[in-house]
Regions:
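Hydrophobic transmembrane alpha-helices and their membrane-interface caps
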Residues: 1-24, 31, 63, 81, ...
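Transmembrane alpha-helices and their membrane-interface boundaries in multi-pass membrane transporters
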Residues: 8-22, 43-63, 70-116, 238, ...
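Extracytoplasmic/periplasmic membrane-proximal domains and adjacent transmembrane bundles
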Residues: 19, 302, 309-486, 490-498, ...
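Alpha-helical membrane-interface segments at transmembrane helix boundaries
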Residues: 36-48, 68-80, 126-141, 163, ...
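Signature of alpha-helical transmembrane segments and their immediate interfacial
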Residues: 43, 114-167, 257, 291, ...
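Transmembrane helices with small-residue packing motifs
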Residues: 62-71, 143, 149-185, 225, ...
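Flexible hinge/switch segments at interdomain interfaces of large molecular machines
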Residues: 97-109, 166-174, 229-239, 270-288, ...
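Solvent-exposed, membrane-proximal periplasmic/extracellular interface segments of envelope transport
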Residues: 189-284, 339-361
């Protein structure tokens, strides 16, 4: 569906060029059938070349890897198919319909005249103004070139005010909240707090919040999925659903920020995490700057993580900072004495197995019903396995059937230990994640790196930036390489069409101004440079050169008909102005709903549409002036070179005629 939305404005470009040229021939008095044939033949090569340049842009997208590849592979295939079909239709169906439906009407109705005559006068006035302006431009070439260079350099200053991010966060109307009370908090108290918060949120966000569910308690040992999550009697997890974005006046990010501020009023929460989108992963997740701290000694890395967290909270745009390593939890550990085990005829494995079965349970039998089979687990009742004294009195039987208490085999002690030990590349790691709200990811990462540079770091500890920023840099690198490849492919296509390296070189001068337009559009709309806006910039490579191809192709046609360089440039510019403006207008108008549209998913595609609108608008305006001017410069240089060659040839002919006898004698 996104491919169709993007292609709506582009799919009619080829038909517009063909239809406009056929209409021009009919207005000059040609028969509609002859006009359809001759008009289509005149622009067929440029239409095909324009389509090939678009395919050269979108086909490489099918080979991108990583997260960007997942996003853009289908887009690339769909756009290639759509552009191919639109070109075939423009070169076959459009001329046929023109021959059958178009005719020069000498008398028009009054209503048509009243409506169309002002538009026609305006367009004719625009054509004449552009012809005069183009006539002045080609006679003041240095002014035009210098002015365009100054404009390009000035637009680069907009880059300083543009932040970077991976993907824009999407409003999917979901929020997850994870709260931690002090370890050891009773489940009844956690449920009471959960119920209180649920009622408050449903009342405070009435008309905005649809559902608010919560879970409290420790997962059972046979609940594999739940046991992999952080859980316990002191941990509360909320799953919240809001109404659709179009049905509320507040954004999902604003709701999350308000909830974070409200949770700060509860001192009983040791940790409070509000997760936009309901998950920390995926393209709907809120942007976060992740700093990975590597080090073997856990006390040292915990200290570094705590210091980094305190300083990151002071960074502008950071609404929440989380440390991946959970608080140390109390647990009972049994230190077995091997001598006592041997004395009672037991080994370490047997004693540990007995202890585990009595606490976690052992499968004693099976229960079968309706063809299904269920395990029956047997274990001690909670009052006999939850305190230090009860653990010490658990009985273990040796081979003789003698019962021995755990306290007679070792010592039961209470210790604090981390729930999990994270590792990456076989090294211990703790991650500090700064949740970003209202600031670009790149700015927060730069601020974090500045903090790290000033911190006194133990020699055995290292910190690396990871997460979304690492994915962003990889995607930017891949898309940059892709852009270079696309530029080369587009140049090859144009060189094959014009059978010249000069004309493609002239057309390529429109690309820098497309990127100027992208920077200006992102700057003035307060948007960030993300993977999506880069995709829009890459799309412009194919869209922008289409206008240049149409101009240069018609200038070449006028030159072949015997017109001078200046006359060819002005004639072609005046003739191709309307199709260039129409194709640009259809693409821009097709992108406007995507740029300003609401609903879920609009946040992702909006930067791409903004980039295309800004880049195409600026490049079209400058292309209509700069490309003809550059053509005159290169054509004038070529003519001067030809004159020098012809002059030398004449001089050689004169010299040969004057010294012919001497040369023959020698």
């Amino acid at each position: 569906m996104s491919s169709l939305s993007i292609a709506i404005g582009m799919v009619v470009d080829d038909a517009i060029v063909v239809l406009e040229n056929v209409t021009t021939h009919i207005e000059r008095g040609s028969d509609p059938k002859q006009a359809a044939v001759h008009g289509t033949n005149e622009v067929a090569i440029s239409v095909i070349a324009s389509t090939l340049t678009m395919i050269a842009v979108f086909f490489p997208l099918t080979m991108v890897s990583g997260m960007s590849g997942v996003m853009f592979k289908q887009l690339g295939w769909m756009m290639c198919a759509i552009m191919f079909i639109s070109t075939v239709s423009a070169l076959s169906l459009t001329p046929m319909l023109c021959a059958q439906l178009l005719k020069l009407q000498k008398k028009q109705s009054k209503a048509f005249t009243m409506f169309y005559r002002p538009i026609e006068k305006s367009l004719d006035g625009l054509d004449n103004w552009y012809a005069r302006m183009l006539n002045w431009s080609v006679r003041h070439r240095s002014v035009i070139v210098i002015g365009c260079i100054v404009f390009f350099v000035a637009s680069l200053f907009c880059a300083k005010g543009i932040g970077t991010e991976f993907f824009p966060a999407q409003d999917n109307a979901r929020i997850a909240v994870k709260l931690e009370l002090p370890i050891g908090t009773r489940k009844e108290l956690a449920q009471e707090i959960s119920e209180k918060l649920t009622n408050y949120w449903l009342e405070h966000y009435k008309g905005i919040m649809k559902v608010c569910n919560y879970t409290v308690g420790q997962a059972d040992s046979d609940n594999t999925f739940a046991s992999m999550q952080d859980n316990g009697s002191h941990i509360i997890s909320f799953n919240i659903s809001l109404v659709d974005p179009g049905d509320r006046d507040i954004t999902l990010e604003q709701v999350c920020d308000e909830m974070r501020e409200e949770l700060k009023k509860y001192p009983e929460f040791s940790k409070a995490q509000v997760i936009l989108g309901g998950s920390n992963t995926g393209m709907s997740a809120q942007a976060s700057a992740d700093f990975e701290i590597y080090g073997y000694d856990m006390a040292t890395t915990d200290s570094v993580a705590a210091r980094l967290k305190r300083q990151l909270l002071d960074v502008k745009g950071v609404s929440e900072v989380n440390i991946s390593r959970s608080d140390y939890q109390p647990e009972y550990q049994v230190d077995f004495d091997r001598e006592k085990l041997a004395l009672h005829g037991l080994n370490l494995s047997t004693a540990a197995t007995y202890l585990r079965n009595r606490i976690n349970g052992a499968v004693a039998s099976k229960y079968r019903e309706d063809g299904d089979e269920y395990d029956i687990k047997v274990r001690y009742a909670p009052e006999y396995r939850t305190s230090l004294e009860s653990l010490e009195n658990i009985l273990v039987y040796n081979a003789k059937g003698e019962a021995v208490r755990i306290k007679d085999l070792g010592t039961v002690v209470e210790r604090f230990a981390p729930p999990t030990i994270e590792r990456k590349d076989r090294e211990r790691i703790v991650t500090v994640s700064a949740v970003i709200s209202g600031a670009p990811l790149g700015d927060v990462v730069n601020a974090g790196n500045a903090i790290i540079d000033k911190m006194e770091m133990p020699s055995e500890v290292t910190i690396q930036v990871a997460g979304s920023y690492e994915d962003q840099q990889d995607s930017f690198r891949d898309l940059g390489t892709l852009a270079v490849l696309i530029v080369i492919l587009v140049f090859i296509v144009m060189a094959a069409q014009f059978e010249s390296l000069t004309y493609p070189f002239i057309i390529m001068f429109s690309l820098p101004f497309a990127f100027s337009g992208v920077l200006m559009a992102l700057f003035f709309t307060n948007s960030t440079l993300s993977v999506m806006s880069l995709l829009g910039a890459i799309m412009l490579i194919g869209i922008v050169v289409k206008n240049g191809i149409v101009l240069i192709d018609y200038i070449t046609l006028c030159r072949e008909r015997g017109q001078s360089v200046l006359h060819s440039v002005v004639t072609a510019g005046k003739s191709r102005l309307r199709p260039v403006l129409m194709t640009t207008a259809t693409t821009v108008l097709g992108m406007i709903p995507m740029a300003v549209g609401g609903g879920q998913g609009s946040e992702m595609w909006s930067p791409m549409a903004i980039a295309v609108i800004g880049g195409l608008t600026v490049s079209t305006i400058l292309t209509l002036v700069l490309i003809p001017t550059l053509y005159c410069i290169f054509a004038g240089t070529g003519i001067k070179h030809q004159r020098k060659v012809m002059k030398r040839k004449r001089e050689l002919d004169v010299y040969f005629e004057a010294h012919k006898d001497e040369i023959i004698k020698k």
